[in-house]
């Protein structure tokens, strides 16, 4: 039996402001830092330890991981950063307020953009200042690898192969692994691990900075999963995520 821990980054500044973030490299809010520290304490309390960590190339996930490992006195842990664990790219929606966008386009349309499996939002133009190809961190990527917008299906197409090629061999080698990533890159992985249908994935919401433990059999198939901490707090946090795309009243 293997275990792997997944954790979404703590609340970011744009989560707090209810904005679409995607590949925009915004920082953690004060609350987000506190959430990550709390997650580290919970993991330590429950006896978890790690000897390998994975995260994206976006600071909100990197800092969440750092806070968790620091709290657990595990800062020596090797960390692999990879763009394939980035949040899904929200295209031209990045930087827009979700509630204001819902007021303009309708809550149902925003829910489709946020949670559907195969419908991407409006794409960025390559001349847009938000285009990732302008950033040094993506200089090693081919032009065709840099998204202008993504749906969850696109995110699955980069996250799941990365899991299979890079993470699975390390789990089989006995490494104790934590993956600190994003709402949609983790939804992509959870969809695969739990074999969630394209239609049902719309209802899955992952709360910020709450450790999600997967127990896997010898074939790396999910046997069970559970969040650490208070179940009511987890439920409330999921509801908060689900409500972000609604018109503000």
Curated annotation (Swiss-Prot):
SUPFAM superfamilies the UniProt entry points to: Phosphoglycerate mutase-like (SSF53254)
Gene Ontology MF annotations: phosphoglycerate mutase activity
Site feature: Transition state stabilizer: 182
Keywords: Gluconeogenesis, Glycolysis, Isomerase
Keyword Transport recorded: no
Catalysis performed (reactions): (2R)-2-phosphoglycerate = (2R)-3-phosphoglycerate
Residues at the active site: 9 (tele-phosphohistidine intermediate), 87 (proton donor/acceptor)
SMART domains hit by this protein: PGAM
Keyword check for Transit peptide: no
Protein's GO biological process: gluconeogenesis; glycolytic process
Pathway assignment: Carbohydrate degradation; glycolysis; pyruvate from D-glyceraldehyde 3-phosphate: step 3/5
Record-linked Pfam families: His_Phos_1
Domain of life: Bacteria
The enzyme's E.C. designation: 5.4.2.11
Function comment: Catalyzes the interconversion of 2-phosphoglycerate and 3-phosphoglycerate.
Family: Belongs to the phosphoglycerate mutase family. BPG-dependent PGAM subfamily.
Name the record gives this protein: 2,3-bisphosphoglycerate-dependent phosphoglycerate mutase
Higher taxonomy: Bacteria, Pseudomonadati, Elusimicrobiota, Endomicrobiia, Endomicrobiales
